[in-house]
A protein has these predicted regions:
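Cytosolic regulatory regions built on CNB/CRP/Popeye-like sensor folds
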Residues: 2-206
Length: 206
């Protein structure tokens, strides 16, 4: 009932680990096209994979924090997940909600808080931090806060408005509806989580 090898398939990058059969086993193998088809046919599959990768990311971040080894600027480049037209489409599907506005320096999320929303910046830029370290910067087209929303676990990082910003807020029910109505949305979000996990793992190994 578990899964492995998904990282390379999602990010189209080389394998970063070795898998060895410790006993006689049978596995279901999916190539890239089959994997994409599975997500399109069963969008909630993307949420399940996201939950697995987020748990791995949380464990890695917790271990690095305990060891006082969490690197600064874990994600070195700002990742744009959605373009302008996709953001407009998301807003329309959400019923054109009012954007949440935060002034520069204002706290948006704090470690340990319940994760009832994830956010997509429509204007401005947000800084994500943990243990006094900057993990990444999220601008227009990016996403943050999805980890706690998907897994229903407490927030694992802080988020502060780096500039004045306007955010699209998405709750868990809306997230599921977006994934089910637009599999490409789920796949893009899944790829983002995979890239974050890959970035943390790569930086931790240096």
């Amino acid at each position: 009932g578990e899964i492995f090898g998904e990282m390379a398939t999602i990010t189209h990058s080389p394998r970063s680990a070795t898998a060895t059969a410790k006993s006689t086993c049978r596995v279901i193998a999916l190539d890239g096209s089959q994997f994409q088809k599975a997500i399109q046919q069963t969008p909630t599959f993307a949420l399940m994979l996201m939950s697995i990768m987020i748990d791995r990311l949380r464990l890695t971040l917790a271990r690095l924090t305990m060891q006082k080894a969490l690197p600064d600027n874990v994600v070195t480049e700002e990742r744009r997940v959605f373009d302008e037209s996709t953001l407009d489409e998301i807003i329309a599907k959400l019923g054109n909600p009012a954007l949440l506005r935060y002034n520069r320096g204002k706290s948006i999320l704090k470690i340990g808080e319940a994760g009832v929303l994830m956010y997509l910046p429509r204007e401005g830029r947000v800084t994500i931090t943990a243990d006094g370290r900057t993990l990444e910067h999220v601008g227009v087209g990016g996403v943050f806060g999805e980890m706690a929303l998907v897994t229903r676990a407490p927030r694992a990082a802080n988020a502060v408005a780096e500039t004045d910003c306007a955010l699209i807020a998405v709750n868990r029910t809306q997230l599921r509806q977006l994934v089910q109505s637009n599999p490409a949305f789920g796949l893009s979000l899944l790829k983002l989580v995979a890239q974050r996990l890959q970035a943390v793992t790569n930086r931790a190994s240096k």
